[in-house]
Amino acid sequence: VTMDQNKLNRVLESMKETGIEQLLISDPASINYLTGRYVNCMERMQVLYLDVEGNHKFVIGKLFPQPEMGVEVIYFDDTEDCVAKLASYMRKGTKIGVDKIWPAKFLLRLMELGVGTEYINASFIVDNIRQIKSAEEQDLMRQASKLNDLGCEKLIPLVSKGYTELEMGDKLLEIYLELGAEGHSFEPIIAYGDNAADPHHESDNSTGKVGDAVVLDIGCIKDGYCADMTRTVFIGEVSDEARKIYEIVLEANRRGIAAAKPGARYCDVDNAARDYITEMGYGEYFTHRTGHNIGMEVHEYGDVSGINENAVSYTHLT
């Protein structure tokens, strides 16, 4: 595993275009995207430092020894001033880009040391590149989605067996592991009855009863790429009102998919689904965006919402 030169060159090109001479990447997913290495350092600092002049470093604690990465690795002790050590390798007097998750305790220390003339949130540089999926990435995501489909197919018959929502999540993990996934891509939402009205319900010890709608918001991770899906099923019987609403949502889904063509804007896709639900009298209950981008993380930069005027592309996966 080593630095992906093609991806690195695209990042460096974007840095030059935006006048950012030095970039600090701390997001583990973005570091993984560029280096093939995912490290969870907990509260400790890890930074992939990129310089348009080519002086790249990966700065990380000694507790996390790294293999050959195609970039020099700089280690610090837990008792060291890790930011000062990072700063010692940086050039002074330039605009510095940091990513959106770098903790203030590190950024403020870097500013105190007077390294840069300006500091900006430069997550967009890697985010924009990650948004464009290669053919290989698309294939990996198809495989993850197919596995997720199989997992959902095996989970649905269990909704009427008396398991609690939490137990259903455990059953789903067993299913994923048996199918060859690495695990959940996010904590699953299994919601029976009234709980299903909460888009981000925290699964609890509730059990289902005849007539309940059951929301299954589930996803797995396979070979480093995520799947995410939401399905609604019913236990035993379906009321006329529930059937009507289900069909409205399904038609809105179809209209959104039909609108998702290259050249359209993401807000057009959102509107295609939202306008139909509003037309049918349920617009006030559509409280969320239509979709979000996905890849190495289950929620990545980019979404299908009413304010996203970016153009749809075959290489953007939502």
Model-derived features with residue positions:
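Active-site neighborhoods and metal-handling regions in enzymes and metal-associated proteins
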Residues: 1-317
